[in-house]
């Protein structure tokens, strides 16, 4: 049976408290430079108090747990929506030193909840070209925003990191799709379709993909995504970026043991992007 990119491990970790980097005076300089062109005020109270968590501290130990010293990564992609509190060098580069190998390090941000799926698509693309045998995606969110946003934003209740390891597996079938007024096919081709922005069309597309997986499919829906008539696990609110993936980390071992195909779905209404992941396991080992 031919091998294909698959999802071998998903780990999650929550953290409380703060990083000492939240009191670094350079953080104020960094945030002030970022918001100055937009005229946004700083949260001087949070900067003085010291709140938030650095993503390197949050994810480094989880990376070491996910990958052993004899499991080098070829590509590491970090995705986040709420900003890191560590000014200076990109966190993805720092995290690349927390796992075996010398992976190409990339970061992806400002894509809402669609960013996690986009990072996985990029990882799978690297694998399909043969550039990467093992690709790692690191998702992270922390609770502090050190400036006032121009419009209301949803911040997480807790600091959280998720690590997803993608490797080549016999018979595995992992597909990530993203739609926003255009359909992205399994081969990443783009074709014109009707808008997926309405509640009805989003729900219908999720139902269609679930039906294609069969009656025994396990369906995991992100917080806020309603699909009437579909038997699914619904992720509670509170972790807008990592919640869906933390739930996958908790449930995937059981679903794999039951040989069930899996569908994850999330809709970012601000961007109008429907993102889905389907996973069919290979033959029993």
Enumerate the predicted regions with their spans.
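Secondary-structure boundary elements
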Residues: 67-71, 125-134, 168-171
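Short, well-ordered amphipathic alpha-helical segments that serve as non-catalytic structural scaffolds
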Residues: 51-69, 198-213, 244-247, 251
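Conserved beta-ketoacyl condensing-enzyme motif
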Residues: 53-100, 214-226
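Claisen-condensing/thiolase-fold acyl-transfer catalytic domains that form or cleave C-C bonds
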Residues: 110-128, 217-285
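Internal, hydrophobic cores of structured domains that mediate oligomerization or house catalytic pockets
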Residues: 97-101, 105-146, 150
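Condensing-enzyme catalytic core mediating Claisen C-C bond formation in acyl metabolism
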Residues: 1-52, 149-215, 275-285
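A glycine- and small-aliphatic-rich helix-loop capping segment at beta-alpha/alpha-beta transitions
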Residues: 90-102, 126, 153, 280-284
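Short beta-strand segments
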Residues: 79, 136-141, 264-268
């Amino acid at each position: 049976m031919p091998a294909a990119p698959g999802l071998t491990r998903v780990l999650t970790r929550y953290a409380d408290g703060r990083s000492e980097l939240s009191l670094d005076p350079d953080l104020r300089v960094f945030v002030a430079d970022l918001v100055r062109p937009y005229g946004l005020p700083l949260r001087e109270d949070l900067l003085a108090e010291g709140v938030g968590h650095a993503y390197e501290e949050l994810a480094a130990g989880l990376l070491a747990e996910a990958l052993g010293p004899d499991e080098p990564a070829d590509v590491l992609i970090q995705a986040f929506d709420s900003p890191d509190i560590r000014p200076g060098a990109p966190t993805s580069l720092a995290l690349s030193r927390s796992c075996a190998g010398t992976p190409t390090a990339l970061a992806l941000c400002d894509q809402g909840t669609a960013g996690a799926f986009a990072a996985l698509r990029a990882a799978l693309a690297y694998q399909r070209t043969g550039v990467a045998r093992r690709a790692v995606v690191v998702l992270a969110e922390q609770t502090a925003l050190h400036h006032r946003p121009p419009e209301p934003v949803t911040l997480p209740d807790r600091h959280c990191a998720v690590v997803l390891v993608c490797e080549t597996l016999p018979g595995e079938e992992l597909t990530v799709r993203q739609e926003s007024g255009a359909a992205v096919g399994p081969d990443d081709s783009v074709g014109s379709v009707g808008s997926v922005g309405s509640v009805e069309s989003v729900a219908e597309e999720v139902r269609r993909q679930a039906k294609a997986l069969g009656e025994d499919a396990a369906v995991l829906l992100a917080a806020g995504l309603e699909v009437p008539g579909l038997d699914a696990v619904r992720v509670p609110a509170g972790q807008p970026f990592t919640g869906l993936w933390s739930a996958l980390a908790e449930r995937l071992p059981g679903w794999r043991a039951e040989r069930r195909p899996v569908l994850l779905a999330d809709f970012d209404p601000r961007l109008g992007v429907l993102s889905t992941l389907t996973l069919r396991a290979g033959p029993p080992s």
